[in-house]
Amino acid sequence: MITITLPDSSTKTFDGPVTGEQIAKSISEGLWRECVAVEVDGAAMDLSEPIATDAAVRLITTRDPEGLHIMRHSAAHVMAEAVQRVFPDAELTIGPVVEDGFYYDIDMEPVSEEIFSRVEAEIKKIVSAKIPFVRKEVDKAEALDRYRDQPYKTEILNEIEDDTVSLYTNGDFTDLCRGPHVPHTGFVRAVKLTKISGAYWRGDQNREQLQRLYGTAFFSKKELDAYLTLIEEAKKRDHRKLGAELDLFSFHEEAAGMPFFHPNGMKLWNALLDYWRLEHRAAGYVEVKTPVMLDRALWEKSGHWENYRENMYVSVIDDNQYAIKPMNCPGGMLLYKEKRYSYRDLPLRVAEIGLVHRHELSGVLSGLFRVRAFHQDDAHIFMTPDQIEQEIFGVLKLVETIYSTFGLGFHLELSTRPAKSIGTDEQWVKATAGLRAALDAYGKGYAVNEGDGAFYGPKIDVHIKDALGRTWQCGTIQLDMSLPERFDLSYIDAGSEKQRPVMIHRVIYGSIERFLGILIEHFAGKFPLWLAPTQAVLLPLNDDMIPYAREVRQEFEQAGIRTEIDDRSESLNKKVRQAQIDKIPLIITLGGKEKEARTLSVRTLDGQVRHGVSHEAFFAVAKEHIAKRLQTPVVFA
């Protein structure tokens, strides 16, 4: 007899080995039809695999996130088979699931998106046939013989240490794969190829260049259509497109991956950092600045030279090797060591907007999202062990304050001790307990990623959600037990003994360049008044009004409102249209009537028009919006 325990703690008994499919059918036909795989004692398996011992079982359905992941894995196989039908000489490599879909790297002649319709036609045939995915475990030697003419698969096989490997076959197509897969190709109900790009085998630019075909898949056409609509909206909001249209930033081949910020971009940048500094001063942080280039010996001491050397830019000065910093932390350690600290001086909260450089392959550079030079809003908090909870809680509240100002929701994930780590059991228990206690006190809920912490300490990752519902990992609250040890940091406790401080390394914006890119897309370039590069534009009705417009601009600037004048010899309608294209929140018309009455005709970006607004009333509303950093539309009575 075999006893199967279900998630609700109920049990089912079977006379002998049983499959997930049989378990599902024993519960209901409807459940069986929606099952894609089964989780047995925490491990995902095919529905057709026998379960030979007592086990805790969870049926994975089309409603579960894991179900979608498994189906997309199967969709990658279906796409690969379809490609081989269209291009018989194409040689397959690997095809993993990624966020929002999957891809397959294929060795074939360069192709374009023109092939998508032909490949998708074959996909439809494969899906309609509802071909079963059949798993077969074979000796590694047999697999090597099977793939002897396929060097990519042979390379993968030679790296596998197990004596047996699994192959999956659906119809005439077989691929090396761990699985699991959906029962048959009919579960891949709605598929769309999305893009194609070049990729190096194993990410090594010295290896073969492949064609990477991306796709996505859903369990229903309705879900696919909703996703494609989202993608189209995302294209309209693409920060690279809006960055050019709004004259915010640019890139040049003379400095690949290093953005050039234009005057409009710098206004946005400064507004972002002015706000950051305001909140950090209020939260008790001091700001510092450390050098961009530091001696190799420092990077050896910090461990970066050993673990991060390939991503660092190095130079030789006076026969000494220096590295441009990829991270701000080591410089912060040197600053701490300059002074002698007592327990009464702690916690010490030190923040830095530091410029860092990291070498990224040219193929992965992507606008402001993936660059080689960027600024990071690092902070290091030095504290005693019993201050961990209160300091983590304080950072969480600061995170909430800052993200809510931009209308960004977020969720939290706690990552605990990995298999390889430094520090004692006692240190890890106390550190993790401090993070948990702070999260529990914060009270907003969190997920736990067991074993996913850094080797030097547990961490909290903060994932923000933008206006399109996309999530971005920006903030990190990392407890670091490595650097205080490496740099021999200390403080004097109440008993006049030296102690090692606990250190939190945290970022909120993360890469400021990347965060700006996220904000551009979040707001679709229509920034709230306080953040907009140009907050108001003055449109003189004729050349005679230009001197008056200059007077008004000076008045606006003195009131703290970033203002420009459009004095081109164009019609008012064209000027208004240009201001709308430039997404300027307040568009103000100045004519003889307005000059005589000392009033303003104000048009907002959302189409509201108000005539006869006094300067005093205008300033009262605009200054309140800016001071309070409101996201709501500006409304004039």
UniProtKB/Swiss-Prot annotation:
The record's remark on the cofactor is:
Binds 1 zinc ion per subunit.
UniProt keyword annotation of Protein biosynthesis present: yes
- Where, subcellularly, is it found? Cytoplasm
* Domain (TGS): residue spans on this chain: 1-61
- Provide the binding site for Zn(2+): C329, H380, H505
Required cofactor names? Zn(2+)
- Record Pfam families: HGTP_anticodon, TGS, tRNA-synt_2b, tRNA_SAD
* Protein keywords: Aminoacyl-tRNA synthetase, ATP-binding, Cytoplasm, Ligase, Metal-binding, Nucleotide-binding, Protein biosynthesis, RNA-binding, tRNA-binding, Zinc
Question: Example GO biological process term?
Answer: threonyl-tRNA aminoacylation
Q: Does the keyword Flavoprotein apply?
A: no
CDD domains xref list: TGS_ThrRS, ThrRS_anticodon, ThrRS_core
Its EC number(s): 6.1.1.3
Give an example GO molecular function.
metal ion binding
Q: What is one GO cellular-component annotation here?
A: cytoplasm
SUPFAM superfamilies, A to Z: Class II aaRS ABD-related (SSF52954), Class II aaRS and biotin synthetases (SSF55681), TGS-like (SSF81271), ThrRS/AlaRS common domain (SSF55186)
According to UniProt, the reaction catalysed is: tRNA(Thr) + L-threonine + ATP = L-threonyl-tRNA(Thr) + AMP + diphosphate + H(+)
Q: Which NCBIfam families match?
A: thrS (TIGR00418)
Q: What role does this protein play?
A: Catalyzes the attachment of threonine to tRNA(Thr) in a two-step reaction: L-threonine is first activated by ATP to form Thr-AMP and then transferred to the acceptor end of tRNA(Thr). Also edits incorrectly charged L-seryl-tRNA(Thr).
Q: Which HAMAP family match?
A: Thr_tRNA_synth (MF_00184)
Q: Which PANTHER family match?
A: THREONINE--TRNA LIGASE, CHLOROPLASTIC_MITOCHONDRIAL 2, THREONINE-TRNA LIGASE
Question: Which family, according to UniProt?
Answer: Belongs to the class-II aminoacyl-tRNA synthetase family.
UniProt-recorded name of the protein: Threonine--tRNA ligase
State the organism's lineage: Bacteria, Pseudomonadati, Thermodesulfobacteriota, Desulfobacteria, Desulfobacterales
